[in-house]
Amino acid sequence: MTCAYLAFTDTGLALAKRLAAALPGSVARCGQDGTSLAEWTGVQFVQSDALIFVGAAGIAVRAIAPHCKSKTTDPAVVVVDECGRFAVPILSGHLGGANDLARTIAAVCGAVPVITTATDAHGIFAVDEWAKHQNCMVLEPERIKLVSGKLLAGQPVYYWTDIPVTGTAPAGLFPAEAPEKADLALTLCPTGQALHLVPRIGVLGIGCKRGTSAEALEAAFAAFCARHGLAAQTVTAAASIDLKQNEPGLLSFCQAHGWPVRFYTAAQLRSTPGQFTPSPFVQSVTGVDNVCERAAVLDAGGSLFYPKFACSGVTFALACRPFAPDWRWQNG
């Protein structure tokens, strides 16, 4: 987590430096070296994962107000009084990690973490915080309040999962009979009106003809996702053979999705263990019988989830990194 600290007095600056020694980040003092509150907040809101104001909560609230957009994208914001007595998360408590950060800051300086989110106050399951710690994306953040609202009202919440989850489900959660009857679903392939948590574990293996455009790859990817009902958000990286490392279309396609793409030699791909879909033509061109499946599995270090899919000169396969969700996670 990239932290940025802003203090307003000498006392606050000393505390900010103390916190930064334990939780590294940039430290600035308002009014010093040309630092203005508005400019600092605007820059750090975009560049940092967490903003820590060492001063009054009112100042922080007014400073961040023009920049707040969405609980899925806003950074964590924590306010610490300059005497180090209280650490108060005021933005992105769960998805942004502000609640956890406030607890950590409190442990460093001896403050009291002031956590005001309802689920934490009542000691019940916080689905968005759990999702963050399980490396899952919340597809429909507007549905978080529906799940939390049921739990707060003492009503049952029914969940569906395609993936085994270690431990016993938290109080108030019960397995659903079918995905369509779930309030909450942990899956790579969302259906129905549940709040869907999508594990960020997928690696997309790519094969393509020379000169394939980014637009052609995008169309093929849409068809691949539609074929399997796959949430595109599960993909976090891409992989292919080194013969494709200078393909403009492939590079642009991956960049547009924010995926790092790694390239492997034919020898590396051949040595990847597993059962793969062979192609004599691919073998003759690349020196290995399959590119997309082997590249995905090699890069993921896990298992093949969806095998080779061909569309207009493009081949895709999906492999998943090891993933072990656990109900037993809870705040320290």
Where are these regions (language model features)?
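Terminal alpha-helical anchor/extension segments at protein ends
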Residues: 199-204, 220, 288-332
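N-terminal basic/disordered segments at the start of proteins
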Residues: 1-29, 307, 312, 319, ...
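Short, structured coil segments at secondary-structure junctions
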Residues: 23, 109, 256-257
